[in-house]
Amino acid sequence: MSTLGDKESIIFKEKSFGGEKWSLQNGSRYGNQAGALRSLKVGKFCKVNIWDKNGTMQTFLGGEYPDITDKLPNVDIVQAIDVQFKYSVDIRFKHNVQGRDPNDFKLTVIPYQLNGVEIVSGGDYSGVQIPELNPPDSEIVCQISIREIKWPGQVFANGSIYFKYTPSNNTVSYRKTEGWPTNCEIVQDDVSGFTITLKSI
């Protein structure tokens, strides 16, 4: 574990840490289309949630796991988070604004009483990490805002949305209210992943 960062996890294609490997920092995720992950190393301050294609979810704390195939034979999604959090809402952001580059805008998501996460349009998923709530299936409200990255940094959307973790099936869902900005849409991609799109400015 000496070469593994405290906030880093490494997933491997073969058992006993062999074959191709991928490094994950806390707040990131890996979507494995082939289902071919067989072992992993988890940093001291990390927690890794892994879903199998059959819906099974397993959490791994800091340590080495040379063979995960008995519990997760066909890995689907790998989510790396800080150890003090329970789950992550994985969000990617894009836009449909004509004449603008894919990465012209920035989405900020701020969960209630937590630090915000900034997500540039056109990129991969970023994790909005959520602690365990009481009760565990409580909703948490998140403030969202979208602005252009270039000067003058004009704001084009402001609003809020609710997310909820369901322990019985280890999935994250969302609920829109009147606070959701009308020029945006959100689509649920999988058990923890969502795409937010800025439709117009």
Curated annotation (Swiss-Prot):
Induction: Expression is controlled by rpkA. Pfam families: Membrane_bind. GO terms for cellular component: cell-cell junction; external side of plasma membrane; extracellular matrix. Coiled coil: none annotated. The keyword Transmembrane helix does not apply. One of its GO terms (biological process) is calcium-dependent cell-cell adhesion via plasma membrane cell adhesion molecules. The keyword Calcium applies. PANTHER family: CALCIUM-DEPENDENT CELL ADHESION MOLECULE 1-RELATED. This is Putative calcium-dependent cell adhesion molecule 2.
